[in-house]
Amino acid sequence: MPQNEYIELHRKRYGYRLDYHEKKRKKESREAHERSKKAKKMIGLKAKLYHKQRHAEKIQMKKTIKMHEKRNTKQKNDEKTPQGAVPAYLLDREGQSRAKVLSNMIKQKRKEKAGKWEVPLPKVRAQGETEVLKVIRTGKRKKKAWKRMVTKVCFVGDGFTRKPPKYERFIRPMGLRFKKAHVTHPELKATFCLPILGVKKNPSSPLYTTLGVITKGTVIEVNVSELGLVTQGGKVIWGKYAQVTNNPENDGCINAVLLV
């Protein structure tokens, strides 16, 4: 045996300490926290180099994870389906039948048809991310810039619970949260102040829809139960869609036209 390998020799003779594996596991668990602490305290060129190294490590790790996932998922065989008599359990195993393609196309067309409305404002100006979301700098040295504050009017439901402020990425100020909208019925030519039920679609971005941001052209759902509208079957209509026609952040109120 080579010199200076006395620890390995001792382990071969007498085995490991009883708490060795537990201590090793705990040390490995602490390592992530220690690296994080080290990264926070570092400044200057040393910090830049360290972050670059960590960035490269993370990319490599993500690539490895992706490779493992690819290996585990079953790949679809695009080869032609064998001609002739095929047992029932092998039918539709490989390749796509023409009927399946047609069925999917019809389903897709139905979805598209269902998603279209005749709206008062068919085209509106897109709202950029810099316009809607203001960057909030945080951290000891105000270096972190992952938080965003919504600068437009938004709707937040009654069941919404805030995350702890430290972990909240999108901040929606109380002053910009609206609960009611002035909705005009195009046939009755009358305006009603109705409670908002939710934001159906913001034309600028799906992110704004999930955040409940209300800008010009947004389709919102309003409670029309007090209007007394009924269906052909005699049931009271509870909610209906309306499109916002003004800029609520400038006017201080939401004006919308009911989609009938």
From Swiss-Prot:
Keyword Phosphoprotein: yes
Segments carrying motif Nuclear localization signal: 11-18
Major localisation: nucleus
Stretches with biased composition (Basic and acidic residues): 20-34
UniProtKB keywords: Isopeptide bond, Nucleus, Phosphoprotein, Ribonucleoprotein, Ribosome biogenesis, rRNA processing, Ubl conjugation
Crosslink feature (Glycyl lysine isopeptide (Lys-Gly) (interchain with G-Cter in SUMO2)) location: 80
Subcellular location: Nucleus, Nucleolus
Single GO biological process annotation from the record: maturation of LSU-rRNA
Entry-annotated residues carrying Phosphothreonine: 81
GO molecular function: RNA binding
Pfam families: Ribosomal_S8e (PF01201)
Region called Disordered, residue ranges: 20-41
Keyword Nucleus in record: yes
GO cellular component: nucleolus; preribosome, large subunit precursor
Function according to Swiss-Prot or TrEMBL: Involved in the biogenesis of the 60S ribosomal subunit. May play a part in the quality control of pre-60S particles.
Protein family per UniProt: Belongs to the eukaryotic ribosomal protein eS8 family. Ribosome biogenesis protein NSA2 subfamily.
Subunit architecture: Component of the pre-66S ribosomal particle.
Protein name, UniProt field: Ribosome biogenesis protein NSA2 homolog
